[in-house]
């Protein structure tokens, strides 16, 4: 059963110090990291006891929306019923699209926006 629209459904960690982040979360929680390959920008699926629980990305050298470096951070993604329709609706309510929808194997489509205050959120 899909999660209700607007509820948390996924988390992502972006880190400029990928090795340090991996070591920390492996040691703290026993997480494992699986590189999804060049086609997906070396995005990594994070698993705990064989269950995929999060995503991870080495953001070192990737420019942010303002042109400066991306900061280390956790991003939260909210479930939507129709990603294209929700992005259009978000724009009508003052959102800015950071990244257009793309599809990830096993998890579905996602996009990043900022709300009118500048807070980033994933859909």
Residue ranges and their predicted role:
Residues 85-123:
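Hydrophobic alpha-helical segments and helix pairs
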Residues 59-61:
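A conserved beta-strand-loop-helix scaffold within acyl/acetyltransferase catalytic domains
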Residues 2-3, 64, 68, 96, ...:
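A generic structural signal for ordered alpha-helices
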Residues 2-5, 9-52, 92, 102-108, ...:
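Core segments of cupin and vicinal oxygen chelate
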Residues 33, 52-54, 63-64, 85-86, ...:
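Short loop/beta submotifs within extracellular cysteine-rich repeat domains
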Residues 8-12, 25, 31, 56, ...:
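Short, structured motif recognition centered on aromatic/hydrophobic residues
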Residues 7-16, 44-46, 64-89, 109-114:
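Vicinal oxygen chelate
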């Amino acid at each position: 059963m899909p999660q209700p629209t607007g509820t948390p459904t996924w988390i992502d960690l972006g880190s400029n110090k990928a090795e340090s982040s991996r070591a920390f979360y492996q040691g703290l929680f026993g997480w494992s990291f699986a590189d999804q390959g060049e086609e997906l920008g070396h995005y990594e699926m994070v698993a705990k006891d064989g269950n995929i629980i999060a995503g991870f990305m080495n953001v070192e050298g990737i420019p942010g929306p303002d042109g400066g470096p991306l900061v280390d951070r956790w991003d939260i993604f909210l479930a939507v019923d129709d990603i294209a329709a929700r992005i259009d609706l978000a724009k009508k309510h003052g959102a800015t699209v950071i990244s257009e929808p793309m599809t990830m194997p096993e998890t579905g489509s996602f996009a990043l926006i900022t709300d009118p205050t500048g807070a980033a959120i994933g859909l």
